[in-house]
Amino acid sequence: MQVDVATGKLALLDRQRDEAWIGGPGVGGGGYGANIGWVNDSCIYYQSEASGYSHLYVYNLRTATKKALTQGKYEVQNLVLSSNKKYFYLLSNEAHPGQKNWYRIKTDGTQKEKITNQLGGYEISLSPDEKWIAFRYSYINKPWELFIQENEPGKKPIQITDKAASEEFKKYAWRDTKIKTIVARDGQNIYTRIYEPKPGTKNKAAVIFVHGAGYLQNVHYWWSSYFREQMFNNLLADKGYTVIDIDYRASSGYGRDWRTGIYRFMGGKDLDDEVDAAKYLVKNMGIDSNKIGLYGGSYGGFMTLMALFTQPNVFKAGAALRPVTDWAHYNHGYTSNILNEPVNDSIAYAKSSPINFVGGLKNHLLICHGMVDLNVNFQDAVRLSQRLIELGKDNWELAVYPVEDHGFVEPSSWTDEYKRILKLFDTYLLK
């Protein structure tokens, strides 16, 4: 809005609007702050998903014109205006949804240049004089290390640290997992990461790892924030399992339509994507359709429950870790964006909450939950357990962790949890 200070009148310059909810990198909402500021006394900059992807725009107040400085099927992140206000610096996944690089572009939209070139991920800070960048860089199987580089195209990075990987870590051949796309039932491309067994060790069983948070990206070329699960997936592959990890509908990094694909129905299109991944494994990778399991935590735990309760012919075993079981009892600020308010959209909550579909459980379920979880409260696991008891289900178990919050901190808890998950899969997928 523009305010005429003499009259107090307001004039609309631009509007962020979404039938689902406003979000995306640099736009605001979903954990992101909004990028907006002055290029000069007559021009402002901001980010918008108006094109379907979060891009950089400028608005000239004198001519009342808007211009997109970036455009395409990619997202702009970490926007910085140079101190002389001649350039914008930014991270984007222009080359590939799972690859980030650092760019600069003139404030008039010309002369866009890529400054970093390594395949992987970057977390970048500009030096005060903007002549250098310091960044953490990582690759799929190489943890984050610190580098510096001159802030110009074609310059070579200088590695500062070599501390992330211990000698024991380096002795193991961590998989450089393949990233590829599979086609969903509606024709959309789903980005996947595949952990393949070594030749001669493959069995016909598969496990799908379901990342948490909903709006998060885990199919990418940098070191995963799910590094424990990444290590566990390597272990599963060593034992002959084929493991697949997908960026299902509502994962980050893929634009507005993907981000809002679960509006009014969590466990809808996102679960369809998991089912389509399972069918891909059977059709293309020699997997037995009776030997597919899945696991995940938080939103991934919720998805595991929905999969076992509503798709029992697809998934034969699952581990739901700290799962949401009833969205009406979860964080209002998170849920109301996606499902609206329980009082005015009860249908969305009913069809999205696993506790309403417990009767569909036919196969084997492991639930793991910390008793002092301040994110997904332990009551979710208790209420679900009571419902399972009421329905006479005997193919489930609950592992309780008395000292753990949402993110476990005790090594013994992590070890116990993953020993139970491994036992679940070995028992019910390999028989």
Model-derived features: positions:
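Structural motif
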Residues: 1, 52-57, 97-103, 142-148
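Multi-bladed beta-propeller domains
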Residues: 3-33, 48, 59-84, 92-95, ...
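Residue-level detector of Asp-centered blade-edge/turn motifs that repeat once per structural unit
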Residues: 39-41, 83-84, 128-129
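Loop/turn-rich, solvent-exposed surfaces of beta-rich toroidal or solenoidal domains
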Residues: 39-49
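Hydrophobic beta-strand positions that form the internal "hydrophobic ladder"
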Residues: 43-45, 88, 133
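Short, conserved, GDST-rich strand-edge loop motifs in beta-rich repeat architectures
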Residues: 49, 91-94, 215-216, 220-222
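Short loop/turn segments immediately following the C-termini of beta-strands
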Residues: 49, 93, 100, 138, ...
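Serine-hydrolase catalytic core recognition
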Residues: 121-431
